[in-house]
Every structure is written in C-alpha cells, then in structure tokens.
Amino acid sequence: MAARTLLCRKTLSSVLRNDAKPIGAAIAAASTQSRGLHVFTLPDLAYDYGALEPVISGEIMQIHHQKHHQTYITNYNKALEQLHDAVAKADTSTTVKLQNAIKFNGGGHINHSIFWKNLAPVSEGGGEPPKESLGWAIDTNFGSLEALIQKINAEGAALQWLGLDKDLKRLVVETTQDPLVTKGASLVPLLGIDVWEHAYYLQYKNVRPDYLKNIWKVINWKHASEVYEKESS
C-alpha cells in the first residue's frame, strides 16, 4: 500500500513542462506514457543559458540543465516505471530496493528545479537585496544579509539552503544533498545554491570561493520573497 501511495503522489508538482526533450528521453517518455504513468520532464528556464554571464557561463548552464538535470529526470522516470512493475508483481524486495533511486533522482530533480528559479539575470533584478518581510526576517535571524551570505559561503559544500521553519517560525540555513523537506516536514526552501563541482568547475576550476562570492550577483531574491510571503502568512 505504501509503495502504491508513493507511486501516485505528485511530489514534484512545482516543475514546469518542457517540450524540447532530448530524443532518448522523448522515446522513453512515450513508452512510459503509453502505460498510463506520469512522466516528469525537464523544466524550461526563464532566461537564456548565457543570461547569467559573466557570473555563470552559458556553457555551464547548458550542460548543467540539459545533461545533469536531465539525467536525474530520466533515471527518476525509469525508477518509477520499475516501481510500478514491482508493485504489480507484488515484488516487495525490488520495491524496497528502488526507494534509494527514487529519493536520489527525484531529489535531484526537485533541487535543480528550485535552483533555476533562484537565479535571475542582473537585467531582470538578479542580485537585488530582499526587501520588506524577507529582508526583515533575515536581519532578525542572522543580523544582516551580509552575515547570512557569510554563513552560507562558509559551509560551501553540497547544496546550501535558506529555509523557513514553519513550526519554529524562523529562518534556517541547512546543508544537504537531498531536498530540504527530508530534514523536516516543516521546512520550506526559499533559496538553494548548488555548490557541487558540476555547477562551477568548468569556469572557476578549484576556486570555489570565487563562485560563491559571485553567485550572489544573480540570486533571485524576488522569487525567494514571494515564497516567503506565501508560506509565512
């Protein structure tokens, strides 16, 4: 019963549709759709790959989006299809084994879908400091925006999250490779920064501090503020 519930739950409802799937992914999706299963697809970006330059190169953005993110989606759909078959056959062993693949690849899909929305070109407000409610909350919980940035940059590994703990009614900083909700059901992601090497190495090589220093120039605080307003009300 738990496996059937997991299969049917739309945990990635915030992901946008993308019609330009790679050929291999499109074939796999068509096969899965013919069996009546929901297929997750690569979300479109709200900006061009080169729009975040010079902070993040167009080459990195294209590879990160079309290759890394797409791989998570492909493997997630594959795992869900295998889960469907295992449940139909009452294969408990395979059902249990697939949970890690579902969590890892589904989590990668969630994380990257959030990350893209957390970025914006400078010409579209990227880097502009948060105002009003979120700005006040940051000052209250961390002292200042600069102090928050220093705290996140000091961690500098995996995925760095600024989240809202709805139970404690405060902002928190967390480091994890999984979606923030796996660390607590009351945690809502406001801002996620990908600090894995694939997000910066082609451009910044092994100088990760420079990547962390510069990425704040294209952070979409407007989007983070909108999520905060909705979730804190």
Swiss-Prot record:
One of its GO terms (cellular component) is mitochondrial matrix. Transmembrane segments: none annotated. Mn(2+) binds at H64, H112, D194, H198. It is found in: Mitochondrion matrix. Its EC number is 1.15.1.1. Residues 1-36 form a transit peptide. It catalyses: 2 superoxide + 2 H(+) = H2O2 + O2. One of its GO terms (molecular function) is manganese ion binding. Its cofactor is Mn(2+). Signal peptide: none annotated. Binds 1 Mn(2+) ion per subunit. Destroys superoxide anion radicals which are normally produced within the cells and which are toxic to biological systems. This is Superoxide dismutase [Mn], mitochondrial. The lineage of its organism: Eukaryota, Viridiplantae, Streptophyta, Embryophyta, Tracheophyta.
